[in-house]
Amino acid sequence: MKKYLLSFAMVVMGSALVTSCISDDDSDKGGSSSKISVTSGLYVVNNGTWGQNNGSLTYFDYESLQTQQLLSGASGLGDTPNDAFTKGDTIFVVGSTENTIFVVNKKDFSIIKRISTVEGMGEAEGYTPRHITGYGNNIYFTTYGGYVGIIDAKTLSMSQIKYKVGSAPEGLTVGGTAGDPVLYVANSDYGYGNASISKITLSSGTVEEIKDEKIQNPQEIVAIGNELYILDWGHYTEDYSRQLDAGLYYYYNGNVTPLVEDATGLGVGMVYVNNMVVGYLLATFSAPYGSASAPTYNLYDTYKRLKYPLNLTGDSGKEIVSPAAIAVDPVRGNIVIASRSKDPDTGYPSYTLPGFANMYTSSGEYVNNTHFQTGVEPHMIGFTFTTQTISY
């Protein structure tokens, strides 16, 4: 039997149990003990305001429930950090405008190294890095030069190997099987009509292109084997007043099926059965540009192949204003949503004021004491993990 890869399942292995200040059970029963992987906190990558050098990282600690605002300014993450990937004690942060991958120490959030993508790949190939993931000892990232670059996670050096993909690549993910891993890349073409998915067979370096008229502007992608779940931003009306056909789509064996209408944000968690990862829990928000409707939220279980509405409750006075990022704690299953703040002068969402984030259970109930401020324009949410010993 082939062992199919779940692209995000490689980040966290182990039990779904979490012990922390926001846990439901703090008891110590004594007796035997075992080690489990737990979520120690979460970080938010904040774009900042373009041209203002105020991109930053916000860290929320699960134990203390305290927040730190980190790495802001030109000496930090600079202008427009866009994505991040955690591997062990290291966070790799993508600096799009800076043409840099920032290597950050997870323990003290100091910058260990700045890796220039244009120096490592070439001016034309390495400009504007966008998204990042990892597999084995390699860190993979996309660039608007139309390439996927590779960093050695141990030596923190740029590989000479790079893969030519489609136009304006965004998110990427690892799928296939353990014996034949495949890197899938979402090529957006900036929404101009020539979008595609690149399929890179890592053992040979062969690059194939997948095209379908329903794939118009793919932004994020996750895989179970060779089954793909694609967040697509669709297209805009001629006057750019409205966004149309955005959504979460399922691709397999040449067929594209819509799953969540109007979805514009995606977070990826795990589905567990008997402490075994069996699929994804995909959290989405639907807030297409120009829509007069309030944002909606959904969960999609890839194991049961079912969609559930996520109705947010219990957050009176700190309701989500304009969702900007969503994530699922892969161990506990809580949903984290980052939002823009409301401008007190205009009453509209602000792109220049600090945002905020809330945590909710998978049934949509606000988790007490988890409302915290972020930097300007929160864009991506990641998690940090540690190992704990529990007694029972």
Q: Model regions: which residues?
A:
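Acidic, serine/threonine- and glycine-rich low-complexity intrinsically disordered segments
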Residues: 157-292
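Repeated scaffold domains used in trafficking and secretory/extracellular systems
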Residues: 78-86, 123-134, 167-176, 214-225, ...
